[in-house]
Amino acid sequence: MLLRIAMTRLSSPADAEDVVQEVFLKLLTTRPHFRDLEHEKAWLIRTTLHRACDVARAAERRTLPLEDAEVLPGRELPEPSPILSAVQALPAKYSAVIHLYYYEGYSIKEIANLLRLPVPTVGTRLSRGRERLRQILKEDVE
């Protein structure tokens, strides 16, 4: 689940794996106290989302023009689905909510608890995210 969450913000599976490893390392080294399993799960999801956003921001700062990039041999990765690519193209506040709702099966109330947001805010982000997703997918078809 955490890997899928990291993948919604990152285009590289290796970066997503690194993020999840860093989150578990932080869990082991800081040893935070949790009230129950739900609290621990919420902490893991929130920390994964924050770390993935940090990595995505850092990647944007160190991007290299395509002409200057060196081509390295490697394994071919399967193309992500057009819908997943569109979800990843959304701003973080929308993609996180959409991913948790549709891919992880959380309710709006559960997402609000996980992200520490008011329930109406989550509903609004879900609605606006769907609309932006429609626009992105419509542009891809045209």
Protein language model regions, located:
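A short pre-motif secondary-structure segment
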Residues: 97-101
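Short, small-hydrophobic-rich alpha-helical interface motif
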Residues: 2, 6, 16-27, 47, ...
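C-terminal flanking helix
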Residues: 3, 24, 91, 95, ...
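DNA-recognition helix of helix-turn-helix
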Residues: 49, 53, 115-139
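Short, charged helix-capping/linker segments at alpha-helix termini
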Residues: 3-22, 32-38, 119, 141-142
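Short amphipathic alpha-helical boundary/capping segments
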Residues: 82-91
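Arg/Lys-rich amphipathic alpha helix in sigma70-family domain 2
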Residues: 29, 35, 46-67, 76, ...
